[in-house]
Amino acid sequence: FGESCAVGLRVEPGAEELLPLNLVGCSNDIELRRFLNSRRIPKNRAYVERILAPFGLRASDTKGIIDVTKGMSLNDPYCVVPAGEGPCFAEYNLFGNSFDTVLSVIAYTGRIPSNQVGSGIPSELSPSGSFPKTWRVVDDRRVLYKAAHDDGLGLEPVSEYLASQVAAAMGLPHVAYDLDVW
């Protein structure tokens, strides 16, 4: 999946409508490479090296990240598998499987818990953005926890919360934010 590497896209006949829109009718690998690169953790993400360390990966290792996560994300239902490998959504989807709680702690705090072994699906290898964040399951709901950068004033979460409150007061469509301590 490197810059000089071409990869092929094979779609089951009749399943073309299930592709991401930018891949429908795609005749070259540029859009496929862009899509696959979007399925990995950003290189500027807080604690990126620590998040990837348990898997022996680097942020630029798109193929390695796809191999671990099958390209799954909480943003959509796409699953990326090698040719010949069976369907994987039920086994790897982040909506119906538990998350790796140790990895969640690393992604949110940068601290590696001692004497703990991770289990579950790694949900931290695809969220975009550079701020510390992690997905958690709270009361059977997937909830994104975001933190501020250590090097800033720490007001980013407060800003998102206040913007959400302003949008609600104005009657605008918005994503509801709340403040919490974890």
Residue ranges of model-derived segments:
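Conserved ATP-binding subdomain of kinase catalytic cores across diverse folds
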Residues: 96-182
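P-loop NTPase switch module centered on the Walker A-proximal segment
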Residues: 1-114
